[in-house]
Every structure is written in structure tokens, then in C-alpha cells.
């Protein structure tokens, strides 16, 4: 009912397009004040597929506006960007998400976006681009300027109309990503050394004063891989603190923060990851509360490798490899260094 009234109108839409869980307080959803809230995870929404990432929801919204305006096909240029966001946000790759990624990958080499073409060329892909490439190579480059300087650098790349200027912008963005990776390695090493000074608790809460807040989530993910614990990395941000968390199965990060929300000024996230802000004087209280509320067992702190069946070496032929390659998009590549 809403869409027809928006087409051709001057109405301002302030939307909440994200895949994070809706925060709760006293049994009520905490929703922003907005003209329109676009969030399939809110209780009043009956959209059948709630696993879309923020960019996926934005793409669906634009698609519907184009469709109702009679501009069919105009959305195709946006599919590679929706695919990149879907992979980099590590949402489940089934249903609509799988369709978005599959169609985005199919069209990425034919994109008319000069900036995206320049970035692909600079990264020197020798084979067709896969979902893993979106998560491990293209996505981190796009995110790097926003982590270290200004996210508009990536936006300007994709809005560039001159091929030579686009090539220069792409080179700078790739260089920025290399700088970001070096900072991440340094901070991960420093954090790991700090963690190893004492017996491992079930939840790691690490304060890194010198860590840039934009790489805190990557550092948390690296520590999670190294120690197999839920990890919160907290950094300075002006006169307060900001944190980013990465989790393991069995520990719902958003719910754990919700249980400790009296120590926080803001928080949001989902089972696997979260972000939050707090006042400096609340740091020790938050640490204690997170540890006290954690119910992980020792068994849950041991990483498990699951598989469907054992495969004999004689079964591994090119036919099987080709068949398995069809299942690639059902995995969720986790962007990292």
C-alpha cells in the first residue's frame, strides 16, 4: 500500500534497513522514529524472507520502485553491489540471498560501472569472480577507506565517469586496504599477547586503547578464530568507548548485550556479531556482567568439525569436483585478512 504513494512523491523515507535483530526492552521492540521502517525482522512485518542484509533490503526496495514505475531491468546494474554486501555481511546464503549473489556474480564482469570495473582490473582476477572473492578481496577494499579515512572515497570510485580517474581511485583504495591489513595484524598480535597473560575466560573482553574503532571487528574475528571464544574488542572513540564483538555457536551476542544493556549507551547486532557504545566508567562493570551472564559449557568452547560423510580418494574425480562447485554459494564466506 505504501509504494504507490512514494513513486514521484517528495516524501522523505528514513528507513532501518539491516539484518540485525530488533532490540527489546521490557518486552517491547525498540524502533527508531521514522516515516517508514523497512525491516523484515520487526514483529509487524510479514515478509517471508527475513535474512536479507541491509543492502539486500535496499535493493528490493529500489527494485519495487523501478517495477512500479515501469522501468523494468533498471535494477540489474545494482545486483553486483547487492551481491557484494550480501556476502560481506555474512548472512545465510540460501533463498533470496543466494539468488542475489548468483545473479550479481553472473553480471559483475558485464557491469557498466566504471569504478567497479577499475577495481576488478586493479585486483587482477585471472579467473571468474566467485563469492569468496567478494568476501576476501573486493569487499575489504571497498570497506578500507571507511575504516581508516572516509567512506566517501569508495562512493566516489563507483560514481566516477572517467576511466583514468577511476583507475587512480581504485589503486588508492587497494593501497588503503593494505594499510588496513597491516594495522589489523599489529592490533591482533597486541590483543593476543594481552589475552595470553592470564587463564582464558569463556568470554574475551579486550580493551585496546590504540586500536582504530573501524578495525575492532576484524581484530575480534581474528581473536575468535585463534582462541575459539566469543570476543569483544573495545576501543577509544572520543570521550567514550566503542566495542565490536564476534561470536561462536551457542552464544547469541545480541541477546548477551541486551542482558547487560544497563552498562551501554547503544548496542545492536545478531547472534554472530554486535556493536555497542558505553561510557568509560562502565567498562569494568560490563566486563564483569558479560562474564557472569555467560552460560557456555567447556564442551561448547571446543571447536567442532562437522562433515556429512567420508570420501575415499578414489571417489575424488573431476565430475565430483564439478558437482560440488554448484554448492559453493550455500556457504557463507567470512571476510577476513
Regions found by a protein language model. Give the residues of each.
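N-terminal small/polar loop signature for handling phosphorylated ligands or for N-terminal nucleophile
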Residues: 9-10, 14-30, 38, 224
Amino acid at each position: 500500500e505504501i509504494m504507490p504513494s512514494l513513486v514521484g512523491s517528495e516524501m522523505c523515507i528514513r528507513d532501518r534497513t539491516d539484518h540485525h535483530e530488533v532490540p527489546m526492552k521490557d518486552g517491547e521492540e525498540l524502533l527508531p522514529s521514522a516515516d517508514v521502517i523497512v525491516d523484515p525482522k520487526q514483529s509487524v512485518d510479514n515478509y517471508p524472507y527475513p535474512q536479507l542484509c541491509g543492502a539486500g533490503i535496499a535493493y528490493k526496495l529500489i527494485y519495487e520502485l523501478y517495477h512500479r514505475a515501469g522501468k523494468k531491468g533498471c535494477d540489474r546494474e545494482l545486483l553486483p553491489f547487492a551481491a557484494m554486501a550480501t556476502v560481506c555481511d555474512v548472512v545465510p546464503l540460501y533463498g533470496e540471498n543466494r539468488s542475489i549473489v548468483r545473479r550479481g556474480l553472473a553480471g559483475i564482469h558485464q557491469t557498466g560501472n566504471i569504478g567497479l570495473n577499475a577495481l576488478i582490473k586493479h585486483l587482477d582476477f585471472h579467473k571468474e569472480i566467485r563469492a569468496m572473492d567478494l568476501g576476501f578481496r573486493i569487499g575489504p577494499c571497498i570497506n578500507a577507506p571507511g575504516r581508516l579515512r572516509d567512506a566517501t572515497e569508495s562512493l566516489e570510485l563507483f560514481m566516477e565517469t572517467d576511466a583514468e580517474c577511476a583507475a587512480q581511485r581504485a589503486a588508492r583504495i587497494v593501497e588503503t586496504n593494505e594499510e588496513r591489513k597491516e594495522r589489523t595484524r599489529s592490533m591482533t598480535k597486541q590483543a593476543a599477547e594481552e589475552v595470553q597473560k592470564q587463564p582464558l575466560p569463556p568470554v574475551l573482553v579486550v580493551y585496546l586503547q590504540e586500536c582504530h574503532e573501524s578495525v575492532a571487528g576484524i581484530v575480534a574475528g581474528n581473536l575468535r578464530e585463534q582462541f575459539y571464544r566469543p570476543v569483544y574488542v573495545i576501543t577509544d572513540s572520543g570521550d567514550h568507548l566503542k566495542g565490536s564483538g564476534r561470536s561462536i555457536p551457542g552464544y547469541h551476542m545480541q541477546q548477551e548485550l541486551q542482558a547487560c544493556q544497563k552498562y551501554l549507551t547503544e548496542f545492536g547486532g545478531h547472534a554472530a556479531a554486535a556493536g555497542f557504545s558505553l561510557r568509560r566508567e562502565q567498562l569494568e562493570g560490563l566486563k564483569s556482567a558479560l562474564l557472569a551472564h555467560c552460560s557456555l559449557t567447556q564442551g561448547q568452547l571446543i571447536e567442532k568439525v562437522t562433515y556429512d560423510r567420508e570420501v575415499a580418494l578414489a571417489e575424488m574425480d573431476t565430475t565430483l569436483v564439478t558437482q560440488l562447485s554448484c554448492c559453493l554459494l550455500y556457504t557463507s564466506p567470512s571476510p577476513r585478512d
